[in-house]
Amino acid sequence: GNDQIETLLMRMGNGTGVKGLQGIHEIRGCIVRPLLHFSRKEIAAFVKANNIQFINDISNEDDSIKRNAIRHQVIPNWEQINPNLNIAFGKMHDYSKENDELVRYAVKLVSKKLVQLDSYGNKKILKEDFDVLPILLRMNVVHEIIGETHLSWRRFQYEGLKKFLIQSRTGQSLSLPMNWRILRDRNNFLLRKDQEVQKLSHKVQPADITDCGNFYFAWEWVNDFSYSENTQWMETIDGGEIKNQNLEIRRWKPGDSFVPFGMKNHKKVSDYLIDSKVNNFSKENQFVLTADNNIIWLCGYRISDRVKVTSKTMDFAKISITQKKLNEEKY
């Protein structure tokens, strides 16, 4: 009733969007408002007819408070012009709710088509198809991904995301509510929820599986070697080159370098990642495998030329990484 009108007028004065025009929800979670559709006059008449005692909060008489000013000065005068004001605002609430349902339906369809999960567990939106959509739909897809469809964003958060989706350049990122971040990559938008920083380094042992937080690292001795078995996350190396050395898998750091397989000279890890067009999210989580502090594998990209298999190799070691999120999370 009047509470709904007051709320809607306040929101309209603040420049609310379509979703804000839904006003107060009659039912939200465990909260139920059974008197929402009754006007102030109807409630006052019911109280008087049934001789119900009530307490009047004197702060409700203070017109310096915005809601009180609307209640005492705006609504009574407006009702002189339109006695059915309560019904009219009720219809606006219903229309806004129907429009929101339409948007949410479209968001579900778009998300199913355009949102994928990359090999690192990031949510990936295909940029070429995403950029042609209306900005309101794009913003709601982001809301859907981070699970904030029922929460209101503050104005600066809303405007910040809108500006980012329209104007951002490759490599730029934006912090979002609930510890999420969005990154504009070359061909995609990537979204990731920042977790607690996992341990930076892990000691590994031959013929063992090591839990490295977001992934497992495995080492096993094998009897032979085939190039066809190698993948992005699995390599076979000359195990004899690193026998009795201290093995460690850790995050890469500035200054790291190695001799990539097939090359003769050292190359900085940072340069290799740039040349490979690796996005910033992936760079932050890039690990290397070292033997006595020398990099022998830029995990997921290239082994060191030092540990390549040759005709003289006697001991074959298969090293691999299994991303936990590939098995545990789906969009």
What are these regions (language model features)?
Residues 2-92, 96, 111-112, 119-130:
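Catalytic subdomain that performs nucleotidyl-dependent activation
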Residues 26-28, 90-331:
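AMP-forming adenylation/ATP pyrophosphatase catalytic core
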